[in-house]
């Protein structure tokens, strides 16, 4: 299809007329109508770049890349040039960039130095219906900009999900509704029953395939999916010829379902493609390719395919009705990744994926009664997430009345209190909520407050392990690089064992970093060791950018100090996750109890009285992830003010918060005087980093 034939471009005159009469407009249209790619071009052709850049925010890195590439090709140019993009640790813009695609976090960073966005004529907030925390914060800040700049324009781009809330927020601004031709989609409610005869008639009879299938924790789900595909391929449904889109809650279930389909009786007729956020750009773009002749494309996706990705040719949608959603507890500073039923609006977005190019069918793997009991819209992220980073950025902008900031949806008071407490534990805020010197230093890094705080601690107190602390921050900024392919778990764990260190995961990260960075053939290294190359390359890139930030501050990047100093620096940022053992395999932090070390940790089933964790997450139980051991003396070095409280957790003695360090030094458990290894198992010498500037 010619992009100019898309519904959005066809309504160019309506959009520009509304924008000429209003500072803010909401553009609402279905996914796939061209909002993301055609609105920037419409603005560029209308001359909006003459008085400043056209800024487009995206909630995801992968969209930032693909959108900038698509728009550049449509304008017959290359990136960077007239079109450029910017995201965390990656700036691909040029002096003549007129259309700037950026992650929403980048716009927040830029507003720190230019609160009224003087270099922009217009900002388009794309995918606003997702209501991420950054999107809500951006909308609040942009509202302040239009109060000062009469020449500034805002477009809020939304799929057909509650666009009225944006109009009300911006003083009843107009909503430009643009319909896209949609074909009818039949809905079939086909609820999952408990697994009984576990899909034996759909699975090939090899022992290996049966083992893959029976290991799954979602046998009934996969049985239902196989039965629907069986009916579709036999021609026993009303489905038009076309491809299949399956919505599943997470990466794990997608991989398991992929294995089931690839070992089914229909495997030779299916072109199965996974789609989730952690995949690289090239892997994600496979979903847009046509299947090989004689095959049907089956895309198995998370909710990323609801509104962020448009896949033509889908005629059958199989909707589990589930998504994995993060919920944060501000009282315990812990997160929970919960598989939860999606809202009615999300269900309907999924259904609509089947009717873009021809009539379709949506199989809902839940009952009509279940659907009718669901909430109309998803819970906004601001009501279920950690607010400490947003509050830190607000303080940086001089906004200290957190409770009365004009968010489109007010966050819970408990969430604000918890975020303030978290920032106070990191020494980031003064009593009047202005930034302390430590808080100001933290803001130099585009990281979560806990990660920037560990870097600041290394700068101020442990300069000899600054490089190692930057590596730790890079690892905690990404997903796990360890891969456990179904059916190869034993081999993968044996490979990962090569990087294990008795001082826990944070020491193991250093070994893995050194081994990967020194590997000549990084692809082969990752294949041999069951590691995710894209994640490790991302870690290298983050480390390089953190090096640049620190160097720009005029601070030398030391390395090779003691393992104890390294763990102290890391633990100061992670003070919320310093825990004491309270029984066999059980730990408590200052705010959470009944914490177990995750089985994937080096420290699983290891004996330690005190530990530090990169995060504490509730899944089936409360788990500490990324764990290393600590000694009593280290606890005093990490936080003299909180040391007595933390140690009392081990002793089970109630004690008030200590305001000063005790003179006594408890007997050490684990030595913190050893030095970081000079040589890893890979033979790479651990040395000071010579920065290539």
Regions found by a protein language model. Give the residues of each.
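Extended, charged helical/alpha-beta scaffold domains that provide interaction surfaces
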Residues: 440, 446, 453, 457-693
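P-loop NTPase motor module signature
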Residues: 1-454, 461, 547-555, 560, ...
């Amino acid at each position: 299809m010619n992009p100019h034939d898309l519904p959005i471009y066809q309504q160019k005159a309506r959009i520009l007329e509304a924008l000429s009469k209003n500072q803010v407009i909401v553009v609402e249209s279905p996914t796939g109508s061209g909002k993301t790619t055609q609105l920037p071009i419409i603005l560029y052709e209308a001359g909006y770049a003459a008085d400043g850049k056209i800024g487009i925010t995206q909630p995801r890195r992968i969209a930032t890349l693909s959108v900038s590439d698509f728009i550049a090709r449509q304008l017959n140019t290359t990136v960077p040039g007239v079109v450029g993009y910017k995201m965390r640790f990656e700036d691909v813009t040029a002096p003549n960039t007129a259309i700037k695609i950026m992650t929403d976090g980048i716009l927040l960073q830029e507003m720190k130095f230019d609160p009224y966005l003087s270099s922009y004529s217009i900002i388009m907030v794309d995918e606003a219906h997702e209501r991420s925390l950054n999107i809500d914060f951006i909308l609040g800040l942009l509202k302040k900009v239009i109060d000062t700049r009469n020449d500034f324009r805002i477009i809020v781009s939304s799929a057909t999900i509650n666009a009225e809330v944006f109009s009300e927020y911006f003083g009843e601004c107009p909503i430009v509704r643009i319909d896209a031709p949609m074909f009818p989609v039949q809905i079939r409610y086909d609820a999952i029953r408990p697994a009984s005869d576990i899909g034996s008639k759909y699975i090939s009879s090899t022992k290996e395939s049966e083992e893959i299938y029976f290991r799954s924790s979602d046998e009934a789900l996969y049985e239902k999916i196989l039965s629907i595909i069986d009916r579709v391929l036999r021609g026993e449904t009303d489905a038009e010829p076309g491809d299949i889109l399956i919505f599943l809650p997470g990466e794990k279930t997608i991989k398991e379902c992929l294995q089931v389909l690839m070992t089914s009786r229909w495997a030779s007729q299916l072109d199965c493609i996974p789609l989730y956020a952690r995949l690289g750009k090239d892997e994600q773009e496979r979903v847009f390719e046509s299947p090989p002749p004689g095959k049907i494309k089956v895309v198995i996706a998370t909710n990323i395919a609801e509104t962020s990705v448009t896949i033509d040719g889908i005629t059958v949608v199989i909707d589990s009705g589930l998504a994995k959603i993060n919920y944060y507890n501000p009282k315990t500073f812990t997160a929970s990744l919960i598989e939860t039923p999606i809202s009615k609006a999300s269900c309907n977005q999924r259904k609509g994926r089947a009717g873009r190019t021809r009539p379709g069918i949506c199989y809902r793997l839940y009952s009509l009664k279940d659907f009718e009991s669901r909430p109309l819209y998803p819970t906004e992220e601001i009501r279920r997430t950690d607010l400490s980073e947003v509050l830190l950025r607000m303080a940086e902008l001089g906004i200290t009345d957190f409770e009365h900031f004009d968010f489109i949806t007010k966050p819970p008071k408990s969430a604000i209190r918890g975020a303030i407490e978290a920032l106070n534990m990191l020494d980031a805020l003064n009593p009047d909520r202005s930034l302390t010197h430590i808080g100001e230093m933290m803001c130099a890094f585009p990281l979560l407050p806990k990660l920037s705080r560990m870097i600041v601690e290394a700068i101020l107190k442990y300069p000899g392990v600054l490089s190692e602390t930057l590596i730790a921050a890079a690892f905690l900024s990404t997903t796990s690089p360890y891969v456990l392919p179904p059916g190869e778990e034993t081999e993968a764990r044996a490979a990962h064992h090569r990087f294990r260190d008795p001082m826990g995961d944070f020491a193991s990260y250093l070994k893995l970093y050194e081994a990967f960075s020194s590997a000549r053939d990084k692809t082969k290294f990752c294949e041999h060791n069951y590691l995710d190359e894209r994640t490790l390359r991302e870690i290298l890139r983050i480390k390089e950018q953190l090096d640049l930030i620190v160097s720009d501050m005029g601070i030398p990047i030391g390395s090779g100090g003691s393992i104890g100093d390294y763990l102290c620096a890391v633990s100061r940022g992670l003070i919320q996750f310093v825990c004491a053992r309270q029984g066999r395999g059980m730990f408590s932090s200052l705010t959470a109890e009944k914490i177990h070390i995750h089985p994937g940790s080096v420290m699983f089933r290891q004996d330690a009285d005190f530990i530090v964790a990169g995060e504490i997450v509730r899944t089936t139980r409360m788990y500490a992830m990324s764990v290393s051991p600590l000694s009593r003396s280290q606890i005093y070095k990490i936080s003299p003010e909180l040391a007595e409280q933390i140690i009392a957790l081990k002793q089970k003695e109630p004690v008030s918060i200590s305001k000063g360090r005790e003179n006594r030094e408890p007997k050490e458990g684990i030595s913190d005087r050893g030095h970081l290894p000079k040589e890893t198992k890979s033979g790479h010498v651990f040395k000071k980093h010579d920065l290539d500037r």
